[in-house]
Amino acid sequence: AEKLEESSAEAKALSYVHDATTSGHDSYQEGQKCINCLLYTDPSQEEWGGCAVFPGKLVNANGWCTAYVARG
């Protein structure tokens, strides 16, 4: 799988960023990032990993998008 580009249409549609702290989106809350999101497929992947929202792409573990769902 290849890394998701922030500039891609799919990433922009969900305001995806590689570094959550740079988000600036109204829904972003401090501490939220891909690695602690329910949609991140393998939390043991600490740098880049799969995401249910972006099939076939890798997202940054420290990234964020508007589909964020806190992992139980």
From Swiss-Prot:
The keyword Glycoprotein does not apply. It comes from the Bacteria. InterPro entries: High_potential_FeS_prot, HIPIP_sf. Transmembrane segments: none annotated. The keyword Transferase does not apply. Keywords: 4Fe-4S, Electron transport, Iron, Iron-sulfur, Metal-binding, Transport. [4Fe-4S] cluster binds at residues 34, 37, 51, 65. The modification N-carbamoylalanine is found at residue 1. GO terms for molecular function: 4 iron, 4 sulfur cluster binding; electron transfer activity; metal ion binding. Disulfide bonds: none annotated. Homodimer. Specific class of high-redox-potential 4Fe-4S ferredoxins. Functions in anaerobic electron transport in most purple and in some other photosynthetic bacteria and in at least one genus (Paracoccus) of halophilic, denitrifying bacteria. Belongs to the high-potential iron-sulfur protein (HiPIP) family. This is High-potential iron-sulfur protein isozyme 1. The lineage of its organism: Bacteria, Pseudomonadati, Pseudomonadota, Gammaproteobacteria, Chromatiales.
